[in-house]
Structures are given as structure tokens and as C-alpha cells.
């Protein structure tokens, strides 16, 4: 039996703790050891959660440890994943029992698949991708590493996300649309053409959001 440590004990970390209790392998392949977070008081006022054991930086990886990263910001996710991988940490996938995954879909490590996610056939998913509840992924889609897909976002067939892309709640990618590295598609936005690297688009049709 492996011991799961959750990176991040804030709001999303608490959600992932609850997800882990309902995920494939809980109680047979892994149990939950606790959280890693540099904010020691992050769980103050919240009952029933395991303790914050250490910060990521100060934690010494044990042979029976496994990890999942519960950070919604893709930049911080990559930062802390890199720290632990340098310590030879082993990451697992958390897949809720209600999720559906189609034939010939390939997935890397450290992925989070929440309740009622629907991933179609022949999809390619890299490492450390988060799918929040009710995300739908069309056939032959490609998703790069450290992406975060928020609730009810949708990717059409043959669409593509490069690394570290964020789709906010209800974002839609039409079939064959590509979102380049580090870009953001805003909530309820519809991407009908390529989204350039490092940009944020918003609206229907999605256009460049200037600050």
C-alpha cells in the first residue's frame, strides 16, 4: 500500500482529498498520508482532514510515498512538481470512479480526473493535466503537460492544447483548434481559431483580452 501526499492544502487541495477518497485504487493501492504546504495554518477551521506534514521544499521523500499536485495555477504546479521530481518522487493519476475514458487514450503521470469527466477515444494526454468535473474531451484531442481544464470546459475532435494552458469554466474549443503554450481561454469563451502562446482570449468568438 502506497501513501499519497497531496501538494497544496488550500481549497483545491481539500477538493482533491475528497476526490482521492472516491478514486480508483483508494484503499487497495494507496491510502492518504497528508498534505504538503508551506502555509502551516491552511487547514485551520477545517475538520476531518489529515495534517500538513511539511512544505514541499523541506519534505524528504520516502520509498512508499506517491504524490499528486493539487495546485490550480499551472506555473506553480510546474514549479512544485519539478522540485519533487528532482527528489525522485513518484506521481500517480487520480481518476474518479464516475469518469469515462475511451479506447486508445494514452495518459501520462500525475493527472487528476474529477467526477463525471468524459474523455473520448484516441486522445493523447501528457503529464500533470487536471480535468475538473464535467469536462468533455473529443476524439483525437492532444493535451500537453501541466494544463488545467476547469469545470464544463470542452475540446472538440482533433483540437490541441500545448503545455501549461488554462481553460476556464465553460471554455469551448471547436474541432481542430490549437491553443499554444501558456495561453488562457476565459470562462464561457469559444475559441474558433488558433490561440497564440502566452495570450488570454475571452468572449464568443474568443478574442485577445488586453489589460
Model region roles, listed by residue range:
Residues 2-20:
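Glycine-rich adenosine-cofactor-binding loop
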Residues 3-4, 31-33, 64-68:
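Short active-site oxyanion
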Residues 6-7, 36, 70, 150:
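Short hydrophobic segments within beta-strands
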Residues 11-14, 75-76, 106, 190:
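Short alpha-helical
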Residues 17-19, 79-83, 125, 196-197:
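Short amphipathic alpha-helical segments
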Residues 25-44:
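NAD(P)-binding Rossmann-fold cofactor-contacting core
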Residues 40-100:
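Phosphate-bearing ligand-interacting subdomains
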Residues 93-209:
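Structural signal for interior beta-strand "rungs" in well-ordered beta-sheet cores
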Amino acid at each position: 500500500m502506497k501513501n499519497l501526499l497531496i501538494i497544496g492544502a488550500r481549497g483545491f487541495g481539500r477538493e482533491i482529498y475528497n476526490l482521492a477518497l472516491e478514486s480508483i485504487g483508494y484503499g487497495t493501492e494507496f491510502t492518504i498520508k497528508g498534505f504538503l504546504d508551506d502555509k502551516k495554518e491552511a487547514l485551520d477551521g477545517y475538520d476531518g482532514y489529515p495534517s500538513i506534514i511539511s512544505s514541499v521544499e523541506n519534505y524528504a521523500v520516502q520509498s512508499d510515498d506517491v504524490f499528486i499536485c493539487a495546485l490550480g495555477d499551472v506555473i506553480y504546479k510546474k514549479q512544485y512538481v519539478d522540485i519533487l521530481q528532482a527528489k525522485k518522487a513518484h506521481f500517480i493519476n487520480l481518476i474518479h470512479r464516475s469518469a469515462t475514458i475511451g479506447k486508445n487514450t494514452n495518459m501520462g503521470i500525475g493527472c487528476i480526473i474529477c467526477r463525471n469527466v468524459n474523455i473520448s477515444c484516441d486522445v493523447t494526454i501528457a503529464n500533470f493535466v487536471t480535468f475538473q468535473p464535467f469536462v468533455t474531451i473529443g476524439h483525437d484531442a492532444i493535451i500537453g503537460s501541466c494544463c488545467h481544464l476547469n469545470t464544463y470546459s470542452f475540446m472538440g475532435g482533433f483540437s490541441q492544447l500545448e503545455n501549461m494552458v488554462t481553460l476556464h469554466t465553460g471554455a469551448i474549443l471547436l474541432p481542430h483548434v490549437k491553443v499554444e503554450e501558456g495561453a488562457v481561454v476565459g470562462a464561457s469563451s469559444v475559441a474558433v481559431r488558433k490561440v497564440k502562446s502566452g495570450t488570454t482570449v475571452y468572449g464568443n468568438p474568443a478574442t485577445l483580452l488586453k489589460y
